[in-house]
Amino acid sequence: RRVIPEPTCEAMATAMEKAQSELHKLGIGAVHNMDGATSFEALQLLRNTGRLKIRVTQSIARDNLDDAIDLGLSSGFGDEWLRIGPLKAFADGALGSQTAHLLRPYEGDSRNMGVAVASKEEIAELVGKAVLAGISCAIHAIGDRANRDVLDIFESVKAESAQRRLRHRIEHAQLLHPEDVRRFADLGVVASMQPVHILTDIPVAERHWGRRSRWAYAFRSLSKSGAMLAFGSDAPVETPDPIRGVYAAVARKQLEGTSDSGWYPEERMTVEETIRAYTAGSAMASSDELTRGTLARGLSADMTVLSRDIFSTPAAEILDVRVVGTVIAGQFVFRDGI
């Protein structure tokens, strides 16, 4: 029985207005929102009253897909502040709960291969329906079996997706079988990943996945294969702070206790590659690369000002970099001493 009432649209809008100010302090000017209908209603309220000061791509929950199709909504509909994004659905669970769907059993538990939240056939039906309606798809997949299944599904709709110019993505792509790494590039599927998880997941991955962890958070391998990488935070599961995410991708170390070379250092990214994945990569994930994501003539004047040149900052000092200014649409929405 539900005891705590759901927040009203007005209450959620008020909370969002405060939250966007906190995101501005972290240098964030755009987000991909995975929350549901009330959240979208609140965002529209902020937009219609001139209070939305962060760019939002709003996903469509599985339960709302039919309603969205009936209304004729498709990915990309909206304006520069609030746009319809992809269908969001789940293929499996998570690492910590040992419910990520694997090709082989978890270490020390020969009967557990994780959980398929929905069958491959169910997800294929959802994706097919979305594609025909002009809606791109973002499917949560953590385990190597879940990632393989979702790649198979995206392969089955490759022609229809290309015809409608839809760009699909796998959310997390956390553990991959090496044979599937190249498929992201071959299929044009975006690997939407959250480097900040590394800061807490290293011992858990080692415990549950063992030597398979070599292919966990395979940033470098995906990048070398030609895959599009889009980095984010998975907030509120992790902090939305992108500086911590940059550190995680570049150093691949916990804040304490990891070797100096990092965890599977062959998968480390450079600062430039990481920043590109957080900016241009995330814009590409939502098919917004022609309007934002890079500093170029004709694109939105959105930028983050840092306390020092992060590109020349040693990995060990990245966490010392501070955001001193955030500019959206050519206007400062946050500044600290500049």
Predicted segments with their positions:
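Divalent metal-binding segments
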Residues: 1-71, 85, 89-146, 159-162, ...
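Short amphipathic alpha-helices and their capping/turn segments at secondary-structure boundaries
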Residues: 66-86, 176-188
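Structured loop/turn residues at beta-strand edges in well-structured enzyme cores
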Residues: 26, 79-82, 299, 319-321
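Short, charged, surface-exposed secondary-structure boundary motifs
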Residues: 66-69, 201-205, 262, 336-338
